[in-house]
A protein has these predicted regions:
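Short, hydrophobic/glycine-enriched beta-strand segments
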Residues: 16-22
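Short, solvent-exposed loop/turn segments at secondary-structure junctions
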Residues: 23-27, 40-41, 86-89, 124-126, ...
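Short, surface-exposed acidic-centric catalytic microdomains
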Residues: 28-97
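Residue-level signal for well-ordered alpha-helical scaffold segments within enzymatic catalytic domains
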Residues: 44-48, 108, 112, 131
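Internal catalytic-core helix/loop-beta-alpha segment
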Residues: 76-124
Length: 176
């Protein structure tokens, strides 16, 4: 199925890191925001890293409030968030089925914010960024394991948090 990315990136002039997924899942597209599948561990990891607790769950009936809460969280912590692809053909949420990939244009983010480091959530996001974007945008990029429910057997929660600690460490270093 051909999918066009319709979720706007989250960023502002204070953003220091850019976290990139591949393409929003069907649940995220329905919610209109990133990582909103009830079993995706991205927001749980972010809460753990920054010792914060969200009031609204990913699948809360008050989805607008859940989205606003997460958007404010990202900006408060100098984090930009988007996806590598603007469109592709994909079956469900399976990155392994991606075909006809078209990358997003990150120019407005790199020209409007001082992005020092990119973190790609999952091997597909990392490989697609490397293939389509890395030569155009001069910022280091790092692989992080996927927070997808499909990755649960390979990565326990504590191991994911340990890997994602790189984000917080980088932010702490860049803001001092």
């Amino acid at each position: 199925m051909k999918v066009i990315h319709e979720i706007e990136p989250v960023w502002d002039a204070g953003s220091k890191v850019l976290i990139l997924g591949t393409m929003p899942s069907p649940a995220s597209r329905k919610a209109g925001f990133f990582y909103m599948h009830a079993q995706n561990r991205f927001w749980q990891i972010m809460q753990n890293l920054f010792c914060e607790k969200f009031q609204f769950k990913n699948n809360a009936p008050e989805k607008e409030l859940a989205v606003r809460e997460r958007r404010n969280f990202l900006l408060r912590h100098n984090i930009a968030l988007w996806d590598v692809l603007s469109e592709c053909s994909i079956s469900g949420a399976s990155d392994s089925t991606i075909k006809e990939a078209v990358p997003n244009d990150f120019t407005r983010i790199f020209s409007g914010a001082d992005i020092k480091q990119l973190f790609c959530t999952g091997k597909t996001a990392f490989n697609l960024y490397k293939k389509y974007c890395s030569k155009k945008y001069n910022a280091p990029f790092t692989y992080l394991p996927s927070t997808s429910p499909a990755n649960r057997a390979r990565w326990q929660d504590s191991a994911l948090v340990a890997e994602y600690e790189q984000i917080k460490s980088f932010l702490n270093e860049s803001l001092t």
